[in-house]
């Protein structure tokens, strides 16, 4: 399942994303962040982090550098093992 999700993200990056203007306020982009998160934490945790990131990607947030965290947290500072 992980390989399928990663392939779908790459498909989006190569064929869909170039058709629209860049809108992501973060580095790496939201799709790359989600790709890295799925690769690092697995499908469910990675997609959860990607979903949280996409919700933050709007004009109400500052944007900037936002790498995938080293550890998985649902709420900042509260680790879920």
Curated annotation (Swiss-Prot):
It is a peripheral membrane protein. The keyword Cell inner membrane applies. Its main location: membrane. It holds the Pfam family YidD. Disulfide bonds: none annotated. One of its GO terms (cellular component) is plasma membrane. Transmembrane segments: none annotated. Coiled coil: none annotated. InterPro entries: Membr_insert_effic_factor_YidD. The keyword Cell inner membrane applies. Could be involved in insertion of integral membrane proteins into the membrane. NCBIfam families: membrane protein insertion efficiency factor YidD (TIGR00278). PANTHER family: MEMBRANE PROTEIN INSERTION EFFICIENCY FACTOR-RELATED (PTHR33383:SF1). Belongs to the UPF0161 family. This is Putative membrane protein insertion efficiency factor. It comes from Thermosipho melanesiensis (strain DSM 12029 / CIP 104789 / BI429). The lineage of its organism: Bacteria, Thermotogati, Thermotogota, Thermotogae, Thermotogales.
